[in-house]
Structure formats: C-alpha cells, structure tokens
C-alpha cells in the first residue's frame, strides 16, 4: 500500500515473512534556485535552494516555471560574462550577488519580465545534462539523490518481478526537503527495528570509496551512525561479495540525521553508491548502483 503525507513524503509498505519491520528512504528533492528579484534591466536575480556549487552553474541552461504553469528557458551567467568586454570575466566571483539568469525572451526591463508572469518565488530548474556512457558511467546533475530513488524503485521491481517475499516487513519512504535539512524529520519511526537512508556516497580526498562501490557511512558532520547496524551492513557486503567501502564524510547530513534531530528513537545507517563531484557535475557508475541494490536486498532479507 502507498500513502502520501501532507508534506509530500511517499510511504510504501511491503509485506514480509516476519514481524520485524525496517525502514528505507531516499529523497526526491534536489538542488536548484528561486527567483529572488528582477533587476531594472530585466535580469533575474536568484537565491539558491540547497547547497549547489555556484561556480558550476556559470553557463548552465535552466528553466523558470511560473505559478500558472508557464515555462521559460534561460542561462545562468556571471555579471561579467564576456571575455571581449570585461576585464574581470575570469576572476569575478561566482556567487548570488555576481550572477543572474538571462531569459531567452525579449525583455529590457522588470515590467517586461513581470508581463511574462514571472514573479518572485518562482522556481528555477537546472539542466541535468544526463548521459549514460558505454563504459557504464552515469553523468548527471542531481544523482544526489535520484540514484538513490532509482535504487529503491529497482528493489520494488525486483521483489515484484521475481515474486520475492522479503524476510522483513519494509516501510519505504521517498522524502522531499532533504536538501534543506528536514526531509525525514516527520517520519514516525515507531515500530521500526532499524532505518537505512539511501543517499550518495562521497568520493575524493582521503575517502576510500570509488564510483563502482557502495559506500557505508560510519560518521558524518551530524555524528556517528549506529555502530551495530553499520557493522551488520558491512557483514552483508562481506557475505555476498558486494564491493564496498566504509567512510567518514567531513561535510554531510542525511534523512537519518533529520530523524535523529527530530527525536526518532531508531537505529539509523547511511549507504549509497559512490558519486564523484557532489552538488556539481556528478558522476557514478552502474556497478556502484548495482552494489547498493544488492546491499538493500540483503538488508531486507531478499538476497540468497
């Protein structure tokens, strides 16, 4: 059965053989921007939604969607966008004060933009530029956490197509608002033995995860994840030959973090496929996606 909360969280219940119930989540919201104001010359000034790496937006195509359903295309640009004109085109800082959205409409002033129906508070969507390579890589913005959502959907597909009844009952959540800090905060953890958030795994610096692995997070900036549950996930990887790494993320929080902050009394863990260049032009590998799916199936008791 499936229900959707007033906040927008989708909850799916999966019947299992036993009485023990576990939770899974992935978030469907992602990064973007919002119209903050319109300049006298018709340029859209914006505020970011979530922690996108702003310099990577310079030159990116986007769409502005109005509240009455209209969509307009545009481009994120520096306020010094032309090498033939501006001395500081290379050095000018890329931030909200020094960037804008150029609309693909004949606008010369703020009134021209308003006549299109564009208002403060309208969302701005960034082009994902999604590609699947012959070598198995997936290149796209917002694999955080579209990859995690796809992995949970694949678990549902496998259970249905293979007619598998998992050992454990499962409550699966697709959350929103994770990128702004409160995605899973309203989830009722009553009756859950444990809870695993499926999000991107970090790649880079001294971390041992690659894009082909599933990353099991031991700790992030919100604190350590449940020691016993994390160890159990590692044991599943060892038992089933799943390529994995255990990592400590220096800058991160998850749906489990939001649940704990809200007072949920449940053991929580965090896993996900290795994703390179997070919150920028991200990349993972299908091997990492498949390893994550295998670990999820093992966790709910659906992998031989």
Predicted regions and their residues:
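N-terminal hydrophobic/helix-forming segments and targeting peptides
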Residues: 1-304
